[in-house]
Amino acid sequence: MMSYLKQPPYGMNGLGLAGPAMDLLHPSVGYPATPRKQRRERTTFTRSQLDVLEALFAKTRYPDIFMREEVALKINLPESRVQVWFKNRRAKCRQQQQSGNGTKTRPVKKKSSPVRESSGSESSGQFTPPAVSSSASSSSSASSASANPAAAAAAGLGGNPVAAASSLSTPTASSIWSPASISPGSAPTSVSVPEPLAAPSNASCMQRSVAAGAATAAASYPMSYGQGGSYGQGYPAPSSSYFGGVDCSSYLAPMHSHHHPHQLSPMAPSSMAGHHHHHPHAHHPLSQSSGHHHHHHHHHHHQGYGGSGLAFNSADCLDYKEPAAAAASSAWKLNFNSPDCLDYKDQASWRFQVL
């Protein structure tokens, strides 16, 4: 700070107290632009500057550094101000859109990307519907595969149906569950889940997976599962811990023992449960997320995404969980639908991956 403040007398002032004061006192110092002050003066744009900025905004909502620098030179402002202006402009756009101004579709784009990245709330909001649809599709497939899944679930997961019933709040969930546990159902499930793994939403995916894993595990161990499912919702982020905290731990143990020890992580257990019968690779951390994917995809190995999922798992899980928790709660249990929802976008990709 001091270096910025050319005049010692105001050194303390600028430093501790009043960045603005400094500004006012030494406008010529150039202090406003670069130094890190407690507070920066509000940047006021002239009409001509705004015209230039708006023109670029009309062209692209996300100008790259070169575009921003070019405009910054044109309007004689630091590039950082240009960047912030665009950030705020996009936010304004989004707000207008949300408040019922549907004319601008660009904001949507913006929204989804964050979703993809990690905005739990947005994602959950946006993707929850997809989750629902996924669950619907899953459930339909589930129903079609119903007899199968039921039998398979019963056979493969043992408690699966029960678990599903208990953990899932909704029928869909249960149907989904079965599918999730079963390959037939899995296709849809995987669909929902797949994408997540692929993308950052992976994280959410992970979560889902975790949930899925839990669910799966639950399927295997119906009792724990019920709790696991809910816990999962509760503590999506820490998948492992969540498993641990949840009955998952119990699953874990059982799963582990039951499954291949190689399951790597707690998540693995859940996925294990999901696919104990499946291959170990399913068991990666991802396995959680793939937990249920796994089952669907056992064939397709989720390991790939498993790994990534894992990472996200912990992180994203939280976000998604919260936002999606309510809606997803059933979904999660179901099949992380809602979590998947988060990844819905990804879902599509996942699907492909999975399928």
From Swiss-Prot:
Matches recorded under Pfam families: Homeodomain, TF_Otx
BP terms from Gene Ontology: anterior/posterior pattern specification; diencephalon morphogenesis; forebrain development; inner ear morphogenesis; metencephalon development; midbrain development; regulation of transcription by RNA polymerase II
Residue stretches of biased makeup (Basic residues): 274-284, 291-303
Location(s) in or outside the cell: Nucleus
Compositionally biased region (Low complexity): 117-144
SUPFAM superfamilies: Homeodomain-like
Cellular component GO terms held in the UniProt record: nucleus
Keywords, comma-separated and alphabetical: Developmental protein, DNA-binding, Homeobox, Isopeptide bond, Nucleus, Ubl conjugation
Chain spans, region Disordered: 91-144, 257-306
Molecular functions per Gene Ontology: DNA-binding transcription activator activity, RNA polymerase II-specific; RNA polymerase II cis-regulatory region sequence-specific DNA binding
Tissue specificity comment: Brain: restricted regions of the developing rostral brain including the presumptive cerebral cortex and olfactory bulbs; expressed in the developing olfactory, auricolar and ocular systems, including the covering of the optic nerve.
Polar residues biased stretches: 94-104
Domain of life: Eukaryota
Location in chain, cross-link Glycyl lysine isopeptide (Lys-Gly) (interchain with G-Cter in SUMO2): K345
Residues annotated to bind DNA: 38-97
InterPro entries from the UniProt entry: HD, Homeobox_CS, Homeodomain-like_sf, Otx1_TF, Otx_TF, Otx_TF_C
Function: Probably plays a role in the development of the brain and the sense organs. Can bind to the BCD target sequence (BTS): 5'-TCTAATCCC-3'.
Family per similarity comment: Belongs to the paired homeobox family. Bicoid subfamily.
Name of the featured protein: Homeobox protein OTX1
Organism: Mus musculus (Mouse)
